[in-house]
Amino acid sequence: MNASTSNYPHSVVTVPAQRLEVRNLSTSFSTDEGVIQSVADVSFNIRPGKTTALVGESGSGKSVTSLTLMRLLPRTAATRVTGQALYTNASGETLDLLQLPEPRMQSIRGNEIAMIFQEPMTSLNPVLTIGEQIAESLRLHKHMDSARALAQALRLLEMVEIPAAAQRVKEYPHQLSGGMRQRVMIALAMACDPKLLIADEPTTALDVTIQAQILELMRRLQIDTGMSILFITHNLGVVAHHADEVAVMYAGRIVEAAPVHPLFAQPQHPYTQGLIACLPSQQRKRAVLVDGKKRLYAIRGQVSSPLEPPPGCAFEPRCDQAIAACREVIPELSLDDDGRSARCILPRIPSGAVTQEVKA
């Protein structure tokens, strides 16, 4: 634990080593066709004031991981969750989110831990005004009266730089543009000053200009508040500029985890190497000739069906470096001396052997 002292005498604020520590998280669903293992033995940490990015293609288990952590999955016999999600709150108390009684989890969800969902149009209530939706959270968690809550909702809309906020606070979601709705989602998430923000593809449906504005807004809010962020995305270009740590997921498992700069400079897992090679800035190096014409590089094949996973490494059917042993065993996530980890039986790239610059 690290301790930092404030400007006030005799006041010491203890900063936890980890804001969230996820250990061996697994989530599966029983269906008529069989058991779907959406998340398998996932572990990662999020430090206070830092951003951890969870990266992977669609279907890799990123969103299910976030919904599991927030306890938003359907509570039925068909859903099975194991592992730990150890959250350290502002008082220094460490809580396993997966084991808390539901009333206690409700007091944390939307308060100490908030979430921005992928599609704001389906996440916002169409029959309530923007102001009413933000005020509801403030009344519930901060026990404000209606007048104070609405006044604070207006200040939050101004904080996320929504123009004419006094007018927008009285409007409904369908009256706002996609970029404005996403700013509303950020205001809603920030309403109760969360210590941890989970952002699930927060810029997917936005154009490049609005995307950059939203990401810059989130960065400034993080600097101002000191919150931690779990950033879920498939966009490695965004990750390169906005994350501190990266965990790469494939078929429900983390296949590589490292600080952002070493991961981009020396990707260890073939899947990570393939994702980086697909970036526009890398295409000139990896373009392939087909019938005399250059084609953009792409990882061949597609993710295997979760109902029929390969017997060994899940990435083996698509891997250009696979050997016979890859079809026989699921590799462990092995940790290097430098704190990096990768789930691959192939030899690691020596430190310093490869250096490449990655741009968005």
Predicted region positions:
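ABC-family P-loop ATPase nucleotide-binding domain
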Residues: M1-S28, S334-A360
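Conserved ABC ATPase signature
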Residues: E171-L176, M180
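A short, proline-enriched helix->beta-strand linker immediately N-terminal to the Walker B motif
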Residues: A191-K195
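Charged, flexible cofactor/metal-binding loops and thiol motifs
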Residues: E93-T94, P259-A360
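P-loop NTP-binding/switch modules centered on Walker-like glycine-rich loops
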Residues: I198-P202, L206-V288
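Short coil-to-helix "N-cap" segments within the ABC nucleotide-binding domain's helical subdomain
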Residues: E33, T79-L86, P101-S107, T129-E158, ...
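A short, flexible loop at the N-terminus of ABC-type nucleotide-binding domains that lies
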Residues: V15-R19, S28-D41, L72-A78, N89-T94, ...
